[in-house]
From Swiss-Prot:
<protein>
    <recommendedName>
        <fullName>Prohibitin 1</fullName>
    </recommendedName>
</protein>
<dbReference type="GO" id="GO:0002639">
    <property type="term" value="P:positive regulation of immunoglobulin production"/>
</dbReference>
<keyword id="KW-1003">Cell membrane</keyword>
<comment type="similarity">
    <text>Belongs to the prohibitin family.</text>
</comment>
<dbReference type="GO" id="GO:0042113">
    <property type="term" value="P:B cell activation"/>
</dbReference>
<feature type="modified residue" description="Phosphotyrosine">
    <location>
        <position position="83"/>
    </location>
</feature>
<comment type="subunit">
    <text>The mitochondrial prohibitin complex consists of two subunits (PHB1 and PHB2), assembled into a membrane-associated ring-shaped supercomplex of approximately 1 mDa. Interacts with STOML2. Interacts with MAP1LC3B (membrane-bound form LC3-II); the interaction requires PHB2 and takes place upon Parkin-mediated mitochondrial damage. Interacts with STAT3 (unphosphorylated or phosphorylated at 'Ser-727'). Interacts with CLPB. Interacts with CD86 (via cytoplasmic domain); the interactions increases after priming with CD40.</text>
</comment>
<keyword id="KW-0597">Phosphoprotein</keyword>
<dbReference type="GO" id="GO:0032740">
    <property type="term" value="P:positive regulation of interleukin-17 production"/>
</dbReference>
<keyword id="KW-0963">Cytoplasm</keyword>
<feature type="modified residue" description="Phosphothreonine">
    <location>
        <position position="8"/>
    </location>
</feature>
<dbReference type="GO" id="GO:1901224">
    <property type="term" value="P:positive regulation of non-canonical NF-kappaB signal transduction"/>
</dbReference>
<dbReference type="GO" id="GO:0051897">
    <property type="term" value="P:positive regulation of phosphatidylinositol 3-kinase/protein kinase B signal transduction"/>
</dbReference>
<dbReference type="GO" id="GO:0005743">
    <property type="term" value="C:mitochondrial inner membrane"/>
</dbReference>
<keyword id="KW-0539">Nucleus</keyword>
<dbReference type="GO" id="GO:0048661">
    <property type="term" value="P:positive regulation of smooth muscle cell proliferation"/>
</dbReference>
<dbReference type="GO" id="GO:0035632">
    <property type="term" value="C:mitochondrial prohibitin complex"/>
</dbReference>
Length: 87
């Protein structure tokens, strides 16, 4: 079920006038014909997979950091108890 996809691009910078011919020749007028819906779906899936993987890695890193902080608190408490008992 391939559908037509309309994409609008907004450029948020002013190109250097001397580079406009090069930009035009590298992009050309047929930029809208370079991708079909199948390619857009495939590329989107890859992007979504990368985003999901990065999210999972961030959650795991946060959990590891929390576990290390808890270990540090326990170690500090144990050292404090040992110090109190050594008096």
């Amino acid at each position: 079920d391939l559908q037509n996809v309309n994409i609008t691009l907004r450029i948020l910078f002013r190109p250097v006038a001397s580079q406009l011919p090069r930009i035009y020749t590298s992009i050309g007028e047929d930029y809208d014909e370079r991708f079909d819906a199948g390619e857009l779906i495939t590329q989107r899936q890859v992007s979504d997979d990368l985003t999901e993987r990065e999210f999972t890695e961030a959650v795991e890193a946060k959990q590891v950091a929390q576990q290390e902080a808890e270990r540090a608190r326990k170690l500090e408490a144990a050292e404090d108890i040992a110090y109190q008992l050594s008096r």
